[in-house]
Amino acid sequence: SKAPLDKQLDLTLLNMSKKSKKPKRSAYNNITRRELIQLAMIRSDNTAARLLCQTYPMGFNRCIDDMNTKVHSLGMLNSVFYDPTGLDDRNNSTASDLIKLASAAANYPEVVHASHQSHLKIKIQRHWFSGNNTNPLIGSRHDIQVSKTGWTTKAGGCLVMLLDTDKGRRVVVVLGSKSTRTRIPEAEF
């Protein structure tokens, strides 16, 4: 969507308690979409990824539909998404499709900026969000343009990186690593 990235989002209605009908306090209230992108990309924050879809201008389901439409328009014909976090076991992709996704992601300045950050520290109201990038190569390798990590029991440790090297643009994809710790050594070359 072309939704504004720097507008603060009022998440009060999303945080309503079903029992008490009163809003629960949320550290994410008054966060911006840009900050949610940073949290989702740098810390692999699943709540942030989910909130990006929950605050999508046309609703959560349309967000998922648009994600699938976008990946298919990129030629990612073996990919399907059921949720924005990657945690749903029905989500599926392939290494060749993820190469296409990484290449397309390089056209989004917010994604590239977040991929370059080795550490995140932002303040939302009185709450600090901080943490290191889930890819420890960020900061030590300056050729990484796009990076995203993931892990589920079914998929194992996963990593996608787009690098601009002296030999040209390269994409590294690691799928099915035994743990989040082994995906990085498997990716280094």
Locations of the language-model features?
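Internal amphipathic alpha-helical segments of the cytochrome P450 catalytic fold
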Residues: D6, A49, Y108-V112
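Active-site SXXK
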Residues: S1-L11, L98
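Short alpha-helical scaffold segments that flank and stabilize functional sites
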Residues: K2, R43, L51-L52, L74, ...
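Acidic helix-start/capping segments at beta-turn-to-alpha-helix junctions
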Residues: Q8-K22, D88-D89, H119-I122
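Penicillin-recognizing serine hydrolase domain
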Residues: R33-R34, P57-F189
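Short, small-residue-rich loop/turn micro-motifs
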Residues: L13-N15, S44, G75
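Short N-terminal secondary-structure initiator segments
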Residues: S1, S17-N29, A105-H119
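Conserved catalytic neighborhood of penicillin-recognizing serine enzymes
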Residues: K18-Q54, F129-V146
